[in-house]
Amino acid sequence: MSNNALQTIINARLPGEEGLWQIHLQDGKISAIDAQSGVMPITENSLDAEQGLVIPPFVEPHIHLDTTQTAGQPNWNQSGTLFEGIERWAERKALLTHDDVKQRAWQTLKWQIANGIQHVRTHVDVSDATLTALKAMLEVKQEVAPWIDLQIVAFPQEGILSYPNGEALLEEALRLGADVVGAIPHFEFTREYGVESLHKTFALAQKYDRLIDVHCDEIDDEQSRFVETVAALAHHEGMGARVTASHTTAMHSYNGAYTSRLFRLLKMSGINFVANPLVNIHLQGRFDTYPKRRGITRVKEMLESGINVCFGHDDVFDPWYPLGTANMLQVLHMGLHVCQLMGYGQINDGLNLITHHSARTLNLQDYGIAAGNSANLIILPAENGFDALRRQVPVRYSVRGGKVIASTQPAQTTVYLEQPEAIDYKR
């Protein structure tokens, strides 16, 4: 396929719209979107969407690219717990080199590009006196920029106050260029340390004009309630749109009375949430007998309350999650199941949880299929969101700045009965 800039995308479907559409591109931007009267023939510098669905690129709002591709190195996480994952990572972290981090991150980034992801927020462990992973990922951010916008979270994996020089390392990471301040209050030694760590996180974000993304209450303990501190600080400082609480799996175990009071604060604060269905359903509930908790935050209730929430991977092939190919439709598929969002409308709108909601979480400004926006989009060989999710379709094309950066030829399956018949899994 030619790498020339496209002028038009034809025969496209758009979410919530009837018929076929053509999208005009100029200088890497969407210049106009017009309805078609019927199927149009392909012309030079046009791309045939083949009556597929055109949507903005997938967004990965939460991944750890510094740990990716390390599952089983040197040991596997046998218990499947978050805490053994941290132990296994500590073993692997001792073997880190600059080139090792870059090679593994690039391998997964290529998978993400192939899967239609063009915006990524990665957490990078800064509980390391040398900041090896951070320095490597800052280089990767510049190298991958033509294909992916990469945000880097300075993530204090072993705590801000509970790790030697944790606060100083976190601040140094921001000085070096990390985009987002991270925290992990539930992993600090005490509740008091956890609360204090959040105050320090907000102070650093204000000092360096950074976003905030907290690993928050990623535990089955119903007494882990640091999300209320995150929301209260965000509300007090007027920073809600710039603040994200990731995981909040303990919310799965909160009692109804407390949750009702909490949701009032969450709505007032305007903070964002990221759930990571594949990893949450794998790591949580490990200390339960039966019944076992699903351990995923209250996504359905957040959606009903108008609170911004999205889905991420968290991990791909590392000590916390031994599987994964960086496919966002797999994340969405699991998320809709475990959150019981299985009505037709909920499924059809589900793509928002890995596109528009995630873009809002990352504070992306130039995003969406609209005239004037950058010509960044993907084409799915599907009629609508429901069809895309049910059939788990590949990304037919990923377009960035008006150029195709990835394409996938759809597989064709044939069954040989009385007569050969192609199977497309459509009704």
UniProtKB/Swiss-Prot annotation:
One of its GO terms (molecular function) is zinc ion binding. It is an enzyme of class 3 (hydrolase). Its EC number is 3.5.4.1, 3.5.4.-. InterPro entries: Amidohydro_3, Metal-dep_hydrolase_composite, Metal_Hydrolase, Metallo-hydrolase_Enzymes. Zn(2+) binds at residues 62, 64, 215, 314. Changing residue 314 to A: Less than 0.01% of wild-type enzymatic activity. This is Cytosine deaminase. The gene is codA.
